[in-house]
Amino acid sequence: MPANVSFEEVAPGTEGSHYALAMIRKAQIRSGQDVLVNGATGAIGSAAVQLLKSLGATVTATCPPDHPELVRKLGADRVIDISAEDFTKDKQTYDLVLDAVGKSSFARCRRLLKPGGCYVSSELGPRAQNPLLALITPLLRRRMVLFPIPRHDQEMIRHLSALIGSGEFTPLIDRRYPLDRITEAYRYVESGHKIGNVVIVVRPPD
């Protein structure tokens, strides 16, 4: 664990971020490439924006109308307000569309992809189609779906830990709850209003 970061701050660094890192690595994103992150205020999306910027990618990110400044602080080069604009009708094209909330689909996002571009989602997609599309679309070699399965391996944890220690990645924490309020924490998460991560703080007995 980085010496300059508390356990509460680093604990969320291996949750949404390991999904985001698996997606980014599977897409083989390089410096200078263009990426759209749908859902940049969630645990996965907020990590994805920061991890992509650490690689030198140019990031467009979507968010609700009350969080554009937060998303810019995460590093997004451009922010799309989902209440004012349908991101799937964006004029720009991308090397990767990373759907961090799993609320869109390859069919809707396909037009956003450059030739050879990738769509990756945190969810199975409509009718659980994403794993199947991940098998079929690479054969067409134009625009494809990826469906990486993240693993908690030591190399990934060390990599994320190093980024946290250097300040290139800071897990976004919305709220902290003590263990005896864990039910309240779950209710808040299920409300759909959280941003980033919710941390349960376990204190040693007196």
List each model region and its residues.
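Terminal helix/beta-alpha structural elements that buttress the NAD(P)+-binding lobe
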Residues: 1-206
